[in-house]
Amino acid sequence: MAYKKRRYKGPNKYHARKAVVDGITFDSRKEAERYMVLKEKAEKGQISGLQRQVKFILIPAQREPDQIGPRGGKKPGKLLERECAYIADFVYTENGQQVVEDTKGMRLSDYIIKRKLMLWVHGIKIKEI
């Protein structure tokens, strides 16, 4: 039986420390603190429909055309490129408007591209905290 060698995970590259609130693990303390603020607003009725880690598809997966299998059934084509998705930290409704929120420490280039694609594809402007 082969065992996988486990690699030691050192400290986070951007010094973010994971935090646990209400049994939920957050990627940073800043995100956990924002969750507590939003949870309090939801309890007061200022916002509704608070969700975490909501996935938005920006570019769907790219596949080769469907093929006919040996028994005549349709078989999905070979995957060429995986989908490109943006995962929002928080999504909620405030004053009848959907708000998509992201807590950011460092604004990396891939995030900036995904932010622009969110506006282009879904017409949603991300609120950065």
Where are these regions (language model features)?
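Electrostatic, structured charged patches in enzyme active sites and in nucleic-acid/phosphate-binding
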Residues: 1-129
